[in-house]
Structure formats: C-alpha cells, structure tokens
C-alpha cells in the first residue's frame, strides 16, 4: 500500500499572486507554446524544442539526448504535449543527466521547476515528494506531478510547461545546474591535481626566495635591462685637435 502524500503548507511565490492581466506583461513574460497554435511544420518543431529546453534545461540539449520516437508521436498527434513532457522526464537521458546525480531533495526541487514551472515551497514539500520517490520510484513521482491538479490547471494537455510569473531573477534553467555540490567531487570538478599545485608552489617559492647580499642573481634583472649598444674608444690624432680655439682667450674682458 502506497503512503499518502504528506501535508505541507505552500509558501509565498509570484505564481500564487492573482494576475493583473496586461500589467503583468513585461520582457520576462514567457512565450506560451500551445499545440492549438500549430499551423506549420516549424510551429510543431518549436513546441518540441521548447519542451526539450524546459525538461532538459538549455545547456543539456544535445543530439544524442533526442527522443525521436516521442517526437514522431507528438508530430502525428498520437500523444499530447502532456505525454510528450512525461516521456522526456522518464527518458534514459534525463535519468542519466539529472536523476542519477542528485539526492532526492534536490531532485524534487529541480523536477518541480521543470515540470510545474515553480520552485519547491519549502523543506516540507521536498520531504513529502522524496517519500513518493522512495516508494514509487522516480517514474511514479513524474506521473504524480504530470497528473496532478496543479499541472492540469496551468498547462492541461496541450501547453508546454514554463516558469510561471517570473517577475524577477533569472530563469530556472540558468540558476539550477543539473547536479549540486555533493556530486562535484564524484564528477571531478573540484578534485585537485597535486602535480600542478606543487609545481606552482615551488615556482613561486623560488621567485620569492631571499638571496644573500652580493649574489650575482640579485642583479640579473638589472643586467638584462642594460642596453647592448657598444661604446668603443674613438681613435683621434693630436694633430686633429685645434688647441688655439680650444683654449679660451683670457685677454678679453
């Protein structure tokens, strides 16, 4: 028997504020992709790529992450946009890139942002959904979100999820990398290569080492700055010197 979802209290977020209509429209207002607006091949392609951007995040759209079977099904109308989003979130690529590299709490927050268009309300909500992941698996968690009343009310069958009422700050996909700090050491992003560290340390120490007075190495920079132009002795004959003009005439006042 599956455990019921634990109760949690929603916190204040922009998407919970009643819309003021046109007053809410600004440069941050997202473009809403609807299947009803499709009138050409380009339009359906835009919906597909908007779905990839939302689910996989902007910096994770690569050719080998494409789900061509799902793309074909949504193009010919076999599945709705809702099921296309569901399929992307359950794909092996999403599991490899996002699910496998996060703990359950962070995974809940990321998935809420990408499927429901909002951040988790608080730690209580993260705990509640983490229990769902523990009992039903990630696939069951995705179904719970996609089939939820919140998803149905905001996106229905034919709208690509988007960040709801982003009035300030940057988009979720730019501030939420696919894995957190606890996975960085495993990924090797913070591991130190001691070979380069020691080489850099001893190079700096060599430069800062104090030399004794009179050590020629102290004058290496000075010697290098001296020009290489030769100053050779001039050859001149005594007969070439005009002594009469060279000696001042002291008889004149």
UniProtKB/Swiss-Prot annotation:
Highest rank taxon of the organism: Bacteria
Principal location class: membrane
InterPro entries for the chain: PBS_linker_dom, PBS_linker_sf
Keyword terms, alphabetized: Antenna complex, Membrane, Photosynthesis, Phycobilisome, Thylakoid
Location of the protein in the cell: Cellular thylakoid membrane
Presence of keyword Transmembrane helix: no
Pfam families: PBS_linker_poly
GO BP field: photosynthesis
Residues annotated as domain PBS-linker: 11-191
Entry membrane topology: Peripheral membrane protein
GO CC entries: phycobilisome; plasma membrane-derived thylakoid membrane
Primary role: Rod-core linker protein required for attachment of phycocyanin to allophycocyanin in cores of phycobilisomes.
Family affiliation: Belongs to the phycobilisome linker protein family.
Subunit structure, as described in the record: Part of the phycobilisome, a hemidiscoidal structure that is composed of two distinct substructures: a core complex and a number of rods radiating from the core.
Protein name: Phycobilisome rod-core linker polypeptide CpcG4
Species of the source: Nostoc sp. (strain PCC 7120 / SAG 25.82 / UTEX 2576)
């Amino acid at each position: 028997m599956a455990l019921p979802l634990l109760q949690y209290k929603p916190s204040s977020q922009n998407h919970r504020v009643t819309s003021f209509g046109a007053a809410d429209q600004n440069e941050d207002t997202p473009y809403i992709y609807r299947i009803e607006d499709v009138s050409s091949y380009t339009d359906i392609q835009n919906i597909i790529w908007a779905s990839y951007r939302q689910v996989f995040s902007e910096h994770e759209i690569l050719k080998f992450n494409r789900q061509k079977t799902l793309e074909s099904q949504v193009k010919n109308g076999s599945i709705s946009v809702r099921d296309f989003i569901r399929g992307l979130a359950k794909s092996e690529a999403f599991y490899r890139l996002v699910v496998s590299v996060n703990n359950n709490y962070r995974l809940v927050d990321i998935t809420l942002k990408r499927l429901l268009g909002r951040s988790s309300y608080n730690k209580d909500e993260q705990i509640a959904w983490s229990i769902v992941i523990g009992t039903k698996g990630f696939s069951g968690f995705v179904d719970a979100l996609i089939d939820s009343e919140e998803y149905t009310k905001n996106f229905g069958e034919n709208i690509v999820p988007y960040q709801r009422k982003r009035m300030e700050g940057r988009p979720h996909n730019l501030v939420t990398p696919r894995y957190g700090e606890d996975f960085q050491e495993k990924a090797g992003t913070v591991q130190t290569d001691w070979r380069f560290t020691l080489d850099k340390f001893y190079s700096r120490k060599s430069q800062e080492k104090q030399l004794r007075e009179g050590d020629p190495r102290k004058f290496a920079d000075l010697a290098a700055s001296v020009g290489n132009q030769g100053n050779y002795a001039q050859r001149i004959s005594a007969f070439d010197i005009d002594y009469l003009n060279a000696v001042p005439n002291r008889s004149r006042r």
